[in-house]
Amino acid sequence: MKFFYSFFLILIFFGVVLVFLFRAGWYPLALVNGNLIWGFSYEQEVNVALKYYDQLTKDKVLDETQKEDIDVEIRRSALEKIIQDVVLADRAEADLGVTVQSEIDSRLAKYMTDKKLEGVANNYFNMTLEDFKKMILEPQALKEIYAEKFKADRKDFDIWFKGQLKAASVTLFTSEYKFNRGILELNS
């Protein structure tokens, strides 16, 4: 009988721990080319996008249906952005070499000393400068590096990138979305 109570208490303990981990975002949301996307990074991306959108539309009056539609689209776009960033970063080392991070850092160095950038990150995105760099600036700099490389080779970056997204191995651990030929769509 003592074994049963001990087992039951251990089971309850692990259940409570799992609930706290899940609420903190420690659950896998997607697997992209072998890289896990965690719930906390998705929620952070969504919160940043919602904060930015609120700043842009603070004077507009929207009804509840419009707000819900916008919220759904922001959530979809946030996950799609994370998937795109992972696919691009995954290809970067193979395509551009191991110096890609140093090139990104050198591009961003001149902006990182600007005090106004910290204010923009804080006021418009509700982020620290370091988080802003990691989530917004670095992926954008990588896209620019690729675009310049493709332009120099007289190729179209957008067509290549769409092909990379179509070829990416994306497994979603949510029934809310489906990844269809490189595009994240809402499940009907």
Predicted features, each with a name:
Residues 10-12, 37, 70, 74, ...:
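Weak global preference for isoleucine
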Residues 21-130:
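N-terminal targeting/tethering segments
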Residues 27, 134-188:
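A C-terminal, polar beta->alpha supersecondary segment
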